[in-house]
Amino acid sequence: MGWGGGGGCTPRPPIHQQPPERRVVTVVFLGLLLDLLAFTLLLPLLPGLLESHGRAHDPLYGSWQGGVDWFATAIGMPVEKRYNSVLFGGLIGSAFSVLQFLCAPLTGATSDCLGRRPVMLLCLMGVATSYAVWATSRSFAAFLASRLIGGISKGNVSLSTAIVADLGSPLARSQGMAVIGVAFSLGFTLGPMLGASLPLEMAPWFALLFAASDLLFIFCFLPETLPLEKRAPSIALGFRDAADLLSPLALLRFSAVARGQDPPSGDRLSSLRRLGLVYFLYLFLFSGLEYTLSFLTHQRFQFSSLQQGKMFFLIGLTMATIQGAYARRIHPGGEVAAVKRALLLLVPAFLLIGWGRSLPVLGLGLLLYSFAAAVVVPCLSSVVAGYGSPGQKGTVMGTLRSLGALARAAGPLVAASVYWLAGAQACFTTWSGLFLLPFFLLQKLSYPAQTLKAE
């Protein structure tokens, strides 16, 4: 199979017709699931992994500890080493997402010109390399290096949404985005449980196995979904617009889309920008609390890695159930209303998690949290996928994913800092109230007719 051809593992002439939509969705689902299984193995292990580097007196980790302790003393705070790992986790998560933020729009713009398949394969090679670096070394520096390489290469997620956005019918796009949500749910169900059951030294090797399998699977079975006649004229045009793709203000204004060929009309562009702001605010708030959740349960309830894995398993199982029974059945045009309901549920969800001192209260909060997490991103992605001409789909979805990466870059660091400074209750209470901001923005959304049709 050549880099730009259709399915199968042997060379053949390029395919000029659109591949079957069901096949594309299935390949995207399975490939993304393998990627997420590798990624989520780490989630229940992170608190213990960071603490193990501290106990091993790793020189780089020790220098981080010393710097944070010095800063705490300088501002008159008591030195609380047990909260330092929360801050470090936020820093690592933010660094990973900063690199996603920088690379995702460039990945999308490049795929608009070269096609989805070759760029996807390059991203997956980088992801596999990141796990190989982690697997072959036990130092904190090597772990950080693997996270940085992974962040640079993580454009495969935005490419998955761009591939679904290439599909011809609004119903196929809507169902495809829901299936991507199912892949996330299953990945966050099975991956953490598997990671928690593995010895710490085996986890990176299993992640590498999943990543290598994903690369081989996509190489053999992913067809090209962007025909030559619908591609952008040149990569140079995309790189020339790098400022639009990397500037936070330009991203929020979708400037790369507005200045491209065949941009959306004025009303639709205004709606697209508001949807982008909602997406950014939601993920900024959600990712911050999501990243601190495992540290809260580790410190308040003394959850072990196995218990963390069980928690993420139940979260993922709930999300997968909601995705299959509810989210994928939302009809085109009903996504915004579903998102508003989910945002309102997050207010009591995070209040219960932040203040709960018993496992039943925590469980109720996690149930509401899981419902919202299963709905918001797939529904917003489905709506946004209806904007832009066929040659702009990669740029539209790459810009959206860059907004998400920017939110995930800032969210964990800000939430972890508030957690470190003021504690879990103050952090979760403040963030739960802030979820009303994206809700009110959607209340005022001008939702043009025919949104789900391709431009």
Curated annotation (Swiss-Prot):
Transmembrane portions of the chain: 27-47, 86-106, 113-135, 148-168, 176-196, 202-222, 275-295, 310-327, 336-356, 359-379, 421-441
Top-rank taxon, per record: Eukaryota
UniProt record, GO biological process: apoptotic process; sodium-independent organic anion transport
Any one cellular-component term (Gene Ontology): membrane
InterPro entries, A to Z: MFS, MFS_dom, MFS_trans_sf
Membrane-topology descriptor: Multi-pass membrane protein
Record-level Gene Ontology MF annotations: organic anion transmembrane transporter activity; tetracycline transmembrane transporter activity
Keywords associated with the record: Apoptosis, Cell membrane, Membrane, Nucleus, Transmembrane, Transmembrane helix, Transport
Major site of localization recorded for this protein: nucleus
Location(s), subcellular: Nucleus inner membrane; Cell membrane
Expression by tissue: Expressed in luminal membrane of renal tubules (at protein level). Detected in all tissues tested with higher expression in heart, splee, kidney, leukocytes and prostate.
Family note: Belongs to the major facilitator superfamily.
Function, as annotated: Probable organic anion transporter which may serve as a transporter for some non-steroidal anti-inflammatory drugs (NSAIDs) as well as other organic anions across the luminal membranes of renal proximal tubules at the final excretion step into the urine.
Protein name as annotated: Major facilitator superfamily domain-containing protein 10
Organism: Homo sapiens (Human)
Gene this chain is encoded by: MFSD10
